[in-house]
């Protein structure tokens, strides 16, 4: 084969590797494009070597071409014959002085091949039957997200192995910037009249069916045509007869799925020429096919700079593309609005992956544009084009509001699985959240997972639920590679914060009225969307949305509280408490009217269509807003409000002990609020069976959930904290500690603790002895009829006896936890909270009667901890709450071991051993720094009790004091909040 034609076009684009091209690459300042060019040159070099291997055969065939009509290939893919005949004729006409033996750097003459080339040629001839591994043109979305190897199939082998959803939905993008000529051509194509035909379609397109260009067209290239590139283009002609743009080297054969014609988009006249790729373009622009107008569909919707909706949109921004995404180049618009509002209102900073992306997870990260050097938004941004597909594959329709935001973070199937994880119970007998970050169920599982009529939820709440579940889920998507969980959780956290609009609870973007800004200013005071002044002309936020915001704050605060950043969690807890108080969640809503609703549904029908629930603003519902105050609120919404308040009430008291702070939510704010329902009745939506309920903070143990056994303890803890704050008051504390009022409060709190202990024993008898003797058949039937949280397989495989045994074990575990916390509250009531003050013992409290009583409760708490380890070895029942009570119940044992050392009683030694075991289990389940630290301190003290005194005994005691001094419960101490 003569190389004259190849040599002639080498100055425009040398496709093969050589010393000259290598030097040019070394001097390039664009390493990303260097990689692309080198990979493309390798592919083209392999193509050239294969041609050289068959040079002898093709020369003989070409010589007989003019005389033998059968020598011409009828197959468009037989490019060896086609290109050889055509380009010899081309070179003979235009270059009479050219020598076929001349060669340029980067090209090899077939007559002067080196031994390496001949060896490669021989290898390729001998291995022609073996499959050649080729680089795939595109990886699926899952493999691209996980950065794993993909085979390009649908579904691919990796997704089949791990059970993932294999999709190719992300936008195709390429690097490089557009030339001025192409930018002008794009603008001209956008302003062309729709339906205007081309005057000369054959001339404009420059292509024929099958991807070939006519001979006269190729002769017009005048030295800028590369036959190897054309051969590679022809290889993909059957799968893609007409390429929408000129693919760069190395990009040939890639299936272009993003440029499919849309029936909803009318064709527009004019074409858009392809774009050169930063010095690596080897084709003349005139040889590139036109861009069908259906290809411009996504750009047609991105007219952010066009103030007139009816005028032709400006597709391309005025500023040049300089390697990064411009923040204002694509403010995502709703194509149905005449005055669109940008969706990217909340930029999330300091993201390590794709920092300029302001789409809140809408565009796939770390991707390049498809055919323009500008970002193309994901199809999930436009509901009219993509949301229809969600309903066909989505298991839980409740996720619809958040799907556009998580499209590039997690697949839909994983989102549904995470929702299952959120509502998963660790027990089949009684509802108990399996996730350590779900401290109590606020919402009814069936209302979220209903296949046709789910609860209407805010995107922020759904994102926070997915984030909470992703912390502990064992899905392969989150465990392989090991960094996947951290990356996904970080993106879900940023998305949740962005959707929540922290501390700003006004109307969402796009829902404001024209005079919203004026309504945010009253009497010269800018209230700025903090929920103080809703739109007085009728724009009201729904009660469900308000509750969703508070629940989202709870999710954020809970996970952060369980981490090492406990002090930072108070910002989120404070926001949740403040918003709950503002929404008056501590008060019962007025009763519903007896009239039926307009849609004909019953008032408290739990299966009613949530889309027909017209919940008003809570300010209006409480009678503080204008308009009609006769509002119908479903029982689900009422119970959600109650449970959310009581959860915040309990965590307020729990965190007051953890962080040595006063209470935020007071008892007088919720004296008239009904106590939460039994969890099993709540999940079954059996409101009739829970008709009688007490109001106000509870004091008695009533159930297996945190609202049944833990909430009464938090009510008593709140009174102990108030008493402790009064004792330590800087001015009145000294007088109060010796007053009769203080003694009366101590006696009253002790009476409440005794009442709780009595109800705890009754609770144990009712659910253990009664079930074992068969005396509580009605209770068993009632409990079993409301276990909708158990999977069908679990119900089918469980027998009645196993269910009863599991219920007994669960009850004993609840009793053990309740007993331990009750003993710790006795210690807090009688003793000191600060470990350094205990060790110093400046007031000789260790010799008082109250110390002896407190020491008895410390031993009792350790015995209860042993029972807890028996029924719950990994302490997974309530890890979020249990740590601080285990710590406070251990301080007296540490004091005894430090003072008595070898003279300690056997019960104290056993108690210390139990505390060490419990702390080790806590570290495994919910690892926190203070638990690791105190475990080391207790081990050191236990070694001293057993008589193993180290040589540096004094130094070890000093180190123990320094460690304990980090956690102070004095006047200015912050407890666990370092």
Curated annotation (Swiss-Prot):
A cellular component term, taken from the record's GO annotations: nucleus
Locations listed in the record: Nucleus
PROSITE patterns, per the entry: ZN2_CY6_FUNGAL_2
GO biological process assignments: DNA-templated transcription; positive regulation of DNA-templated transcription; xylan catabolic process
Biased composition, class Basic residues, residue ranges: 83-93
Record bears the keyword Phosphoprotein: no
Gene3D superfamilies: Zn(2)-C6 fungal-type DNA-binding domain
Biased composition range(s): Polar residues: 18-32
DNA-binding region: 140-166
Start-end of Low complexity biased regions: 53-69, 94-103, 184-193
Entry's Gene Ontology molecular function annotations: DNA binding; DNA-binding transcription factor activity, RNA polymerase II-specific; zinc ion binding
UniProt-annotated stretches for the region Disordered: 1-39, 53-116, 179-223, 238-293, 588-629
Alphabetized UniProt keyword annotations: Activator, DNA-binding, Metal-binding, Nucleus, Transcription, Transcription regulation, Zinc
Bias-annotated ranges (Basic and acidic residues): 71-82, 214-223
Database matches in CDD domains: GAL4 (cd00067)
Pfam families per record: Fungal_trans (PF04082), Zn_clus (PF00172)
Task of the protein: Transcriptional activator of the xylanolytic system. Involved in the regulation of extracellular cellulolytic and xylanolytic genes and in the regulation of the intracellular activities of D-xylose catabolic genes in the pentose catabolic pathway (PCP) in response to the presence of D-xylose.
Similarity-based family: Belongs to the xlnR/xlr1 family.
Protein known as: Xylanolytic transcriptional activator xlnR
């Amino acid at each position: 084969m003569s190389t004259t034609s190849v040599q002639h076009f080498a100055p425009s684009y040398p496709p093969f590797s050589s010393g000259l091209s290598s030097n040019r690459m070394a001097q390039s300042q664009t390493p990303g494009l260097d990689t692309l060019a080198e990979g493309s040159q390798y592919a083209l070099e392999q193509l050239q070597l294969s041609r050289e291997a068959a040079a002898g055969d093709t020369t003989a065939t070409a010589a007989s071409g003019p005389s033998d009509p059968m020598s011409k290939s009828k197959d468009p893919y037989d490019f060896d014959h086609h290109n050889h005949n055509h380009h010899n004729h081309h070179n003979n006409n235009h270059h009479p002085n050219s020598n076929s033996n001349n060669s340029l750097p980067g090209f090899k003459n077939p007559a002067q091949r080196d031994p390496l080339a001949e060896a490669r040629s021989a290898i390729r001839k001998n291995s022609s039957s073996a499959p050649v591994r080729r680089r795939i043109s595109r990886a699926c979305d899952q493999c691209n997200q996980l950065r794993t190897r993909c085979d390009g199939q649908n579904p691919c082998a990796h997704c089949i192995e791990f059970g993932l959803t294999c999709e190719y939905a992300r936008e195709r993008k390429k690097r490089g910037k557009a030339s001025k000529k192409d930018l002008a051509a794009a603008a001209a194509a956008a302003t062309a009249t729709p339906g205007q035909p081309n005057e000369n379609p054959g001339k404009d397109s420059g292509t024929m069916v099958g991807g070939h260009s006519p001979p006269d067209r190729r002769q017009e290239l005048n030295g800028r045509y590369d036959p190897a590139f054309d051969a590679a283009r022809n290889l993909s002609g059957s799968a893609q007869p007409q390429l929408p743009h000129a693919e760069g080297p190395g990009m040939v054969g890639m299936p272009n799925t993003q440029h499919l014609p849309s029936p909803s988009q009318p064709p527009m006249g004019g074409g858009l020429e392809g774009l050169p790729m930063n010095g690596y373009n080897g084709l003349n622009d005139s040889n590139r096919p036109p861009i069908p107008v259906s290809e411009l569909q996504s750009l047609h919707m991105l007219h952010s700079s066009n103030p007139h909706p009816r005028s032709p949109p400006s597709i391309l921004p005025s500023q040049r593309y300089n390697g990064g995404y411009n923040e204002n180049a694509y403010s995502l618009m709703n194509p149905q609005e005449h005055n669109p509002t940008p969706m990217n209102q909340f930029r999330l900073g300091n993201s390590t992956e794709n920092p300029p992306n302001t789409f809140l997870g809408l565009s796939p990260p770390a991707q390049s544009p498809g055919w323009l050097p500008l970002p193309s938004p994901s199809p999930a941004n436009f509901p009219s084009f993509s949301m229809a597909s969600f309903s066909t594959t989505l298991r839980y329709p409740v996720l619809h509001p958040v799907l556009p935001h998580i499209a590039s973070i997690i697949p839909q199937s994983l989102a549904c699985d995470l929702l299952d994880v959120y509502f998963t119970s660790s027990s089949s007998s009684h509802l108990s959240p399996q996730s350590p970050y779900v401290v109590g169920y606020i919402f009814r599982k069936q209302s979220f997972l209903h296949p046709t009529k789910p609860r209407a939820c805010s995107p922020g709440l759904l994102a926070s639920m997915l984030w909470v579940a992703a912390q502990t889920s064992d899905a392969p998507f989150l465990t392989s590679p090991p960094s996947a969980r951290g990356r996904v959780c970080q993106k879900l956290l940023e998305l949740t914060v962005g959707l929540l609009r922290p501390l700003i609870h006004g109307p969402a973007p796009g829902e404001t009225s024209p005079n919203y800004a004026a309504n945010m200013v009253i009497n010269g005071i800018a209230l700025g969307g903090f929920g103080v002044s809703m739109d007085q002309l009728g724009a009201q936020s729904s009660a469900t949305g308000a509750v969703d915001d508070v629940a989202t704050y709870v999710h954020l605060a809970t996970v952060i509280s369980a981490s090492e950043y406990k002090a930072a969690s108070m910002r989120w807890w404070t926001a949740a408490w403040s918003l709950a108080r503002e929404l008056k969640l501590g008060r019962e809503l007025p009763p519903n009217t007896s009239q039926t609703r307009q849609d004909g549904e019953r008032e408290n029908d739990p299966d009613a269509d949530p889309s027909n629930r017209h919940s008003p603003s809570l300010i209006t519902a409480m009678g503080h807003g204008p308009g009609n105050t006769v509002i119908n609120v479903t029982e689900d919404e009422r119970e959600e409000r109650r449970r959310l308040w009581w959860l915040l009430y309990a965590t307020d008291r729990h965190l007051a002990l953890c962080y040595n702070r006063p209470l935020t939510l007071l008892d007088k704010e919720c004296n008239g609020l009904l106590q939460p329902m039994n969890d099993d009745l709540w999940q079954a939506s059996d409101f009739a069976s829970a008709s009688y309920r007490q109001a106000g903070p509870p004091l008695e143990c009533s159930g297996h959930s945190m609202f049944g056994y833990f909430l009464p303890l938090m009510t008593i803890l709140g009174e102990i904290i108030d008493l402790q704050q009064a004792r330590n008051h800087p001015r009145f504390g000294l007088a109060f500690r010796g007053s009769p009022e203080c003694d009366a409060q101590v006696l009253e709190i002790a009476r409440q603790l005794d009442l709780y202990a009595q109800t705890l024993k009754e609770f144990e008898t009712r659910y253990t002895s009664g079930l074992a003797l068969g005396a509580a058949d009605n209770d068993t039937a009632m409990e079993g009829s409301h276990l909708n949280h158990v999977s069908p397989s679990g119900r089918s495989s469980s027998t009645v006896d196993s269910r009863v045994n599991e219920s007994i074990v669960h009850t004993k575990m609840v009793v053990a936890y309740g007993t331990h916390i009750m003993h710790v509250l006795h210690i807090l009531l009688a003793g000191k909270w600060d470990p350094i003050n205990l060790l110093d013992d400046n007031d000789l409290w260790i010799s008082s009667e109250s110390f002896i009583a407190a020491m008895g409760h410390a031993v009792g708490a350790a015995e209860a901890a042993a029972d807890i380890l028996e029924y719950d070895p990994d302490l997974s029942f309530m890890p979020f709450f249990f740590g601080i009570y285990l710590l406070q119940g251990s301080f007296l044992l540490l004091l005894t071991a430090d003072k008595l050392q070898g003279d300690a009683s056997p019960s104290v030694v056993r108690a210390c051993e139990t505390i060490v075991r419990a702390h080790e289990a806590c570290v495994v389940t919910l690892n926190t720094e203070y638990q690791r630290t105190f475990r080391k301190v207790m081990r050191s003290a236990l070694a001293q009790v057993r008589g193993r005194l180290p040589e540096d005994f004094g130094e070890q005691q000093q180190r123990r004091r320094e460690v304990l001094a980090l956690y102070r419960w004095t006047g200015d101490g912050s407890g666990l909040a370092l």
